[in-house]
Amino acid sequence: MCGICCSVSFSIEHFSKELKEDLLHNLRRRGPNSSRQLLKSAVNYQCLFSGHVLHLRGVLTIQPVEDEHGNVFLWNGEVFNGVKVEAEDNDTQVMFNSLSACKNESEILLLFSKVQGPWSFIYYQASSHHLWFGRDFFGRRSLLWQFSNLGKSFCLSSVGTQVYGVADQWQEVPASGIFQIDLNSAAVSRSVILKLYPWRYISKEDIAEECGNDLTQTPAGLPEFVSVVINEANLYLSKPVVPLNKKLPESPLEIQCRNSSSTSGTRETLEVFLTDEHTKKIVQQFIAILNVSVKRRILCLAREENLASKEVLKTCSSKANIAILFSGGVDSMVIAALADRHIPLDEPIDLLNVAFVPKQKTGLPIPNIERKQQNHHEIPSEESSQSPAADEGPGEAEVPDRVTGKAGLKELQSVNPSRTWNFVEINVSLEELQKLRRARICHLVQPLDTVLDDSIGCAVWFASRGIGWLVTQDAVRSYKSSAKVILTGIGADEQLAGYSRHRARFQSLGLEGLNEEIAMELGRISSRNLGRDDRVIGDHGKEARFPFLDENVVSFLNSLPVWEKVDLTLPRGVGEKLILRLAAMELGLPASALLPKRAIQFGSRIAKLEKSNEKASDKCGRLQILP
């Protein structure tokens, strides 16, 4: 993962050879392993490229990269499939080499159509004076734009900053395709034309879908001198997933027979489903595809060579490379169980569980606390060593997600007692929440600005920071997760009707309405969730990875009719995400399989910490910068 930025100026007086310090600071936090800036000047414009790398695979490749023709590339992504990247290679260099070899626009689009994995990029073509940029189909990596000074400058960046009273604020680049700007033309005309190469479905007959609403994701707040147009050659990117199967059953009996034996939410209900040969086969296919997704996201990671014996590695000195945002719910439990298959047994897995407490406690509630102030267990000095959370001991925050998290831990320990499962209790006081929201989180959540964005953004920021308590049979100690990769279950609810609004739509409009709701959820996930979560997690120099949004996982689920994935005639805790619950049963997780959906803002209790009478869609004043 990286922090990438390109600042473009069309006038000398508005050009700076350095990024503003607050923006540079935010970018460096995303990429702690290397930083570099590169200036490219032409007759009519200047470009300042800034790259900050979190090194995770292959040889450390310092960004931005430049070739002998003056082309420049910034890459914030992971190639998990589609383009060949050898184990010892770095995907930044592989992608740049492939781009440099492209002879025309069609070849560039073909390259990005092949990539499976999250990405955002900025690519400068020196010979044509074209600047290309964009995000993957789901928008799993953040990219923002800011246009200012009446057409005299603009900036692209992984993360922005908030400044009180400044009108030209950042917006998310829509994940509707790849954009191209002719810099020479923009400089002469004093207007910026964003040429869009949209995503399209390609049929089996190699026919592209008709261009209908390619511009609907374009933000409404662009200044007058900026316009978005579809490229005149009608070129496009091939969507990386198959269309959603909206087939309806020929008769109600086709689905009623599946649950006629029971309408209760019990383990036996799920076991009955698995007695059906067709259902069991689909569930096993789902597990196999999701398993490959998790494997790719775990093995695409450089691990430190450790020559110590296995006996030594089993001690607390072993470092976790993978962490999971963990509530004990079915999403995180299935991810943890599959991750356990591929992570070396002598390597711990960090389970990050966050809770918010209403007021600061004084003192430590448990005597004989063993504080480890060395190696990766050290409480770091930056923003945290004297923070209220350091005084919030374990056992002080038995919120719903803590209760289900501990139950999930026991279930995982029974599945694999040989694994070291680090259940990290992350307790956040109101004082620390307010302090770090002002200092850090508000800059990351923006340009999203609702109460829901505030709650989720803050919860994910503290969880992914990984500073808390590690409670074992022998001791309780302060702990900081060393994992650079964080797996999260986002995407499961959107695809598998996990939200209450899915059930409401089903009750009012049946399966047809449910299909439309699922399509809408997946279509807006880039603008609603993923850019924000990437900025929030990346702020700790860590990378978010989303197994449920692997292209093959989404294609498999999209190919199934809705009644083979969910059954909302059954009660909460069974009917929604049914195929995932059945997978949990197959993986030996029967208790977790029956837990109903609980959103992180409620499970962690952050929603009740401040104003409890707000609506999720309200604009959140706590995210605004004050004078």
Swiss-Prot record:
Residues 2-184 form the Glutamine amidotransferase type-2 domain. The active site is at 2 (for gatase activity). GO terms for molecular function: asparagine synthase (glutamine-hydrolyzing) activity. Residues 308-597 form the Asparagine synthetase domain. The keyword Metal-binding does not apply. Keywords: Amino-acid biosynthesis, Asparagine biosynthesis, Glutamine amidotransferase. Residues 373-404 are annotated as: Disordered. SUPFAM superfamilies: Adenine nucleotide alpha hydrolases-like, N-terminal nucleophile aminohydrolases (Ntn hydrolases). One of its GO terms (biological process) is asparagine biosynthetic process. This is Asparagine synthetase domain-containing protein 1. It comes from Mus musculus (Mouse). The lineage of its organism: Eukaryota, Metazoa, Chordata, Craniata, Vertebrata.
